[in-house]
C-alpha cells in the first residue's frame, strides 16, 4: 500500500512537471527525471525482485501503468510544444500578400530570329532540311558556280566586301546550295538561312542582313510546284489569304526567273522574294546532269519579311539595340 501511494504521488508530480515544461529541452529534462535510469520509477522497478511473486505481480502492474501514463503525457506535451514552435515560426515568416509584386524582366528572341525560325519551320514541315555554310566564301562558290563569271555584268548587282582577289564575305547563301549539290545526290530539298553582306546602308538596306534561300532538285520539279510552295509560305507567314503575283525577272542562276509580289491593304504591290528554275549551267557546275534533273530555287530577305509582318519602315531599327523597340516582340 505504501508503494502504491508513492506511485500515485509520483504520477501527480510527473504530470505537473510535464505540464509546466515550456519547451522541448525542459520537457526532455522532465523525461529523464521521471523515467530515466536513475529515476525513482527505475528504482522501484529494481525493488520488484525482492518481493514475493504475488506482490511483485501487483506492484509491477502498478509501475507499468504509471510509466505508461507518464510516457503518454510526455508524447502529448511534446506534440503540443512542436505545434506551438511551428506556429510561432510560421507567424514570424508570414508573407504580406498585400504588397505589390515585383515583375521580373526576362529576355526574348530577337524579332529577326523569330521570323527566320518561323520561315524555316514552314519549310521543314514541307520536307526541307536546313543547311548552313561558311560566311567567308570563295569567288567560285559565290559567283562562278552560280553562272556569274568574272566578266559577267551581273557582278555589278553586288557590292561585295573582298578580303583578297579570291575570298569575300558572301553576298547570298547560294554558295551553301552549290556545296550541298557537290556532295549530295538528288533529290535535294534544302533551305539555307544565314547572314549575308553587301556594301549598302540606308533605310531599307544594311551591310549585314539575313537571307533564306531554298533549293529543290529532282527529276520532275516544275515552276507550278514552286508557285504553290511560295504561295502557301506567304499565306501561312502573314496569316491571311494574300493576292500574289509572279513577275518575269532576271537572275543569272535561274531561268526562267521571277519576282514575287504581294498586295498590301492599300492595294499596292510589294516585292517580297525572287525565284526561278535552276539554270542548267548551275546544275552542271555542281556535277548534276541537267538533262536528267531539274530544280527550282528561291531567296528572301528575313528583315524584309519582318518589316512587312510588324509594320516597321526602317530596317536599321533591328540593330540599334533599343530595348524599348525589342521589348515589343517579347
UniProtKB/Swiss-Prot annotation:
One GO term (biological process): phenylalanyl-tRNA aminoacylation
Chain sites annotated for binding Mg(2+): 255
Listed InterPro entries: aa-tRNA-synth_II, aa-tRNA-synth_II/BPL/LPL, Phe-tRNA-synth_IIc_asu, Phe-tRNA_ligase_II_N, Phe_tRNA_ligase_alpha1_bac, Phenylalanyl-tRNA_Synthase, tRNA-bd_arm
Keyword Transcription regulation (UniProt): no
Reactions this protein catalyses: tRNA(Phe) + L-phenylalanine + ATP = L-phenylalanyl-tRNA(Phe) + AMP + diphosphate + H(+)
Domain of life: Bacteria
Details of cofactor binding: Binds 2 magnesium ions per tetramer.
SUPFAM superfamilies reported in the protein's UniProt record: Class II aaRS and biotin synthetases, tRNA-binding arm
PROSITE patterns per UniProt: AA_TRNA_LIGASE_II
Cellular localisation: Cytoplasm
Reported cofactor(s): Mg(2+)
GO molecular function (one): ATP binding
Keywords recorded for this protein, A-Z: Aminoacyl-tRNA synthetase, ATP-binding, Cytoplasm, Ligase, Magnesium, Metal-binding, Nucleotide-binding, Protein biosynthesis
CDD domains: PheRS_alpha_core (cd00496)
Acyltransferase listed as a keyword: no
GO cellular component: cytoplasm
Enzyme Commission number: 6.1.1.20
Pfam families assigned to the protein according to its UniProt record, in alphabetical order: Phe_tRNA-synt_N, tRNA-synt_2d
Subunit description: Tetramer of two alpha and two beta subunits.
Family: Belongs to the class-II aminoacyl-tRNA synthetase family. Phe-tRNA synthetase alpha subunit type 1 subfamily.
Protein name (database record): Phenylalanine--tRNA ligase alpha subunit
Gene of this entry: pheS
Amino acid at each position: 500500500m505504501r508503494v502504491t501511494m508513492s506511485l500515485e504521488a509520483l504520477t501527480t508530480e510527473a504530470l505537473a512537471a510535464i505540464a509546466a515544461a515550456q519547451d522541448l529541452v525542459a520537457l526532455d529534462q522532465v523525461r529523464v527525471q521521471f523515467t530515466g535510469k536513475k529515476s525513482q520509477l527505475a528504482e522501484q522497478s529494481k525493488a520488484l525482485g525482492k518481493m514475493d511473486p504475488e506482490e511483485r505481480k501487483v506492484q509491477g502492474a502498478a509501475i507499468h501503468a504509471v510509466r505508461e501514463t507518464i510516457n503518454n503525457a510526455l508524447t502529448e506535451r511534446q506534440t503540443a510544444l512542436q505545434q506551438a514552435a511551428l506556429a510561432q515560426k510560421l507567424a514570424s515568416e508570414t508573407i504580406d500578400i498585400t504588397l505589390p509584386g515585383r515583375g521580373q524582366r526576362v529576355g526574348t528572341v530577337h524579332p529577326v530570329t523569330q521570323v527566320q525560325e518561323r520561315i524555316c519551320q514552314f519549310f521543314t514541315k514541307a520536307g526541307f532540311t536546313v543547311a548552313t555554310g561558311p560566311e567567308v566564301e570563295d569567288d567560285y562558290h559565290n559567283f562562278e558556280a552560280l553562272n556569274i563569271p568574272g566578266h559577267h555584268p551581273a557582278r555589278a548587282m553586288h557590292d561585295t566586301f573582298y578580303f583578297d582577289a579570291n575570298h569575300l564575305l558572301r553576298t547570298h547563301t547560294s554558295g551553301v546550295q552549290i556545296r550541298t549539290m557537290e556532295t549530295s545526290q538528288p533529290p535535294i530539298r534544302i533551305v539555307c538561312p544565314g547572314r549575308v553582306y553587301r556594301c549598302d546602308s540606308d533605310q531599307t538596306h544594311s551591310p549585314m542582313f539575313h537571307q533564306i534561300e531554298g533549293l529543290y532538285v529532282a527529276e520532275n520539279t516544275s515552276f507550278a510546284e514552286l508557285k504553290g510552295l511560295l504561295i502557301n509560305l506567304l499565306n501561312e507567314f502573314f496569316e491571311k489569304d494574300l493576292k500574289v503575283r509572279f513577275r518575269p525577272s532576271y537572275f543569272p542562276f535561274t531561268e526562267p526567273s521571277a519576282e514575287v509580289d504581294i498586295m498590301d491593304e492599300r492595294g499596292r504591290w510589294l516585292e517580297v522574294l525572287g525565284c526561278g528554275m535552276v539554270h542548267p549551267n548551275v546544275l552542271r557546275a555542281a556535277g548534276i546532269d541537267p538533262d536528267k534533273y531539274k530544280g527550282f530555287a528561291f531567296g528572301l530577305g528575313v528583315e524584309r519579311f519582318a518589316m512587312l509582318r510588324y509594320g516597321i519602315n526602317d530596317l536599321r531599327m533591328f540593330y540599334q539595340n533599343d530595348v524599348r523597340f525589342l521589348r515589343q516582340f517579347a
